[in-house]
Amino acid sequence: MTLRSQSVEQSSPHQTAGFADSIKPQLQCGIQRALISVIITTYNRTDALNAVLRALAAQTDRGFEVVVADDGSDQQTAQLLEPWSASFVRLGHVWHEHRNFRAAEIRNRAILQSCGELCVFLDGDCIPRPNFIQAHRRLAEPGWFVAGNRVLLSRQLTERILADHLEPELWALRQWVEARLRGDINRLQPLLSLPLGPLRRLGGAAWRSIRSANLAIGRADLLRVDGFDAAFSGWGREDSDLVLRLMHSGTRRKDGRFATAVLHLWHAENDRSRLAVNDLLLHAAFRDGRTKAQIGLSSL
């Protein structure tokens, strides 16, 4: 059965008996050392989310749970998740009412509902390849977060993948070379697999250009900085703020390139009207050497 938690800021028109009403999400399990928690953000895009869940269900490493961090989708998302529940160790669904873009807050709610010692953040339009979990497990190390990367897919290729239920996560390199020649992907290099070894630690203090679309962080490191900062609302900079505070607290970056790349389905550009405000918040965190979120996990 899919486990669901709903933040009751006010009653939702999509509420059903399947939702457990709770103002403050409560952890539903003990922390499990070998378990990875994959936290997927989504908002009203069930076709893309279905492709992501399909790819996760076929992972070579099965020791993970999935918690869907739902920024206020309609009931179709809950209906999509129910049949997938048998495919994972545990499938959780954390929902709050949609009020602008609140990825930081819903990720925090999902963290509180997760059980793994390692949290892997993944966007609901980013398809992982079969060894995604295995690679993140291999790279995980206390005191280091792993910044993965992505390949951007064109609108035309995205529409074909979703309409025809294609499985690009299983494509051979030759198919990706052809896609690159057609202009259907922005780059090919992330799809190559390289060991890199100690070279992955060379950019330990680099915090720019890291995206929470593919980011792995130890639970202890997340708790130390109080998670994401829900002061960031609207699109942009909440992931940069988290990374910056992690580094201020002593956590360092490990490069996940050539090991953990995901396939980012095309979508229209998000509303960026709050970006200037979020830039100011990020600048303040940088200037003040802040480690703790202003509105973090402890506020829930």
Give residue spans per PLM region.
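Short beta-strand/loop segment that forms part of the nucleotide-sugar
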Residues: 63-75, 92-96
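Cell-envelope/extracellular polymer assembly enzymes that use nucleotide-activated donors
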Residues: 35-37, 65, 241
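Acidic helix N-cap motif at the loop->helix transition within catalytic regions
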Residues: 50, 75-83, 131
